Amino acid sequence: MSKILSFWFTFLLLAGAAQGQIPTTFFGMGVAVTTDPPKVNYGTLSHPAVAWTSIEGTARGTYSFKAIDAFVKLAPKDANGVALIDLVFGWTPGWAVADQTTCFHNKNGTVSCTAPPDNIQDWVDFITAVVNHYNGVTAPHVKYYEIWNEMSNTKFWTGTPAQMVALAQAAYPIIKQDPYALVVTPSVVWKSGVNYMTEFLQGGGYLYSDLLSFHGYPSQTGGGQPVPVPMPESPLSTNAPIMTMITTFRGIADTNGMLNKPIVTTEGGWGTNGVSDPDMQAAWITHYEILQAGLAATNNLQFQTWYTWGYVQSGTIETSTGDPTPAGLAYNVVLTWLAGFTPSPCTLSGNIYICQVAFGKQIVWDTSQTCSDGACTTEPYSVSTAYTKYEDITGLKAPIKSGVVNLGIKPLLLVK
């Protein structure tokens, strides 16, 4: 990333944002390993390795914070030195479960299980140890604690909503002893998560939650699902368009005890090998960021997360040499379009998405266009003569001639 972009982003992070404006903390980034820190800008570090087995995996009462400490150290810090990280719990250690039928062995020799602990005191002791460790002295305070990863996914949880409420109820008063900490609901995936989150909140989970978390994957990948996946706004998404996910979980929160409390996308993207063409990846990630930013104010979406940085299969925006892909570079550029402004919800006019960022700034793209093998289609698009220049997602700036731009699937920022 350029030194100018990095300096600008750091300045905004420290300065904060006025009410209603998109803060830099809105842009969350997952990280695969701490030895490969993101070379893109981000304001919140989201979704490190699930923490219970990582910290207390070997034996009851034996804690090793080394792995999670590395993520906390990597996270941006606010003016109070609080680590802006979503620390996620999940997978019960094997020693805490007598029935091992839901358990599996990890490469490091520990055992993880999807069942709840037999004795909730083990959970209480673990949460207490974590909060005591991240106390601002031995280690930085942590901003967000997510109770469990994907409680609606049997790969992570095979207990009931009521059992998850019990874990949240036990953890909440301990975590809230830290005045800087916020408790995030267990995350859910679409579509099973709609009902599961509703049951969790109606069962009392709303009493022990400061924010509602969901994972924003518009389309499924793997298991024979078609690729490339549709664009994140597409009605052909095999899960749901990202806008539908946001408004749905906003409604679930508001009608089940969390009226006006923030919601967060703690993980999301095109998924495992969902998009392979570099130009379409750049278009996809920028649509994803812009659409969510447009709904931030009206839905109290506090932050959203791209999963993930790292040379891995899911949402890959890093090259084999450790640099940002064209999608990663485009992500950086679009952050400069959005941070510090108050975007309105994007609207669709024919094939054209129109996203008003601020007075004199508008983002547009044409959903009917595409890219393949280094070539992208465009169509002439007439703009108001008030707009005199544009910027593309590579950062290239140019004057608008005769009130017309060549518009494709990649967004353009129009500027008066």
Give the label of every model feature segment:
Residues 6-15:
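Bacterial N-terminal signal peptides
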Residues 75, 130, 145, 171, ...:
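Conserved, mostly hydrophobic/aromatic
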Residues 40-209, 213-234:
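Substrate-binding cleft and catalytic face of glycoside hydrolase catalytic domains
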Residues 265-338, 345-351:
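Aromatic/acidic polysaccharide-binding cleft in carbohydrate-active enzymes
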Residues 141-145, 168-197, 244, 250, ...:
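Aromatic-lined carbohydrate-recognition surfaces of secreted/lumenal glycan-active proteins
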Residues 347-385, 410:
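Carbohydrate-binding surface patches
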Residues 21-51:
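Boundary/entry segment of secreted carbohydrate-active catalytic domains
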Residues 397-416:
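C-terminal beta-strand-rich structural cap/linker in extracellular carbohydrate-active enzymes
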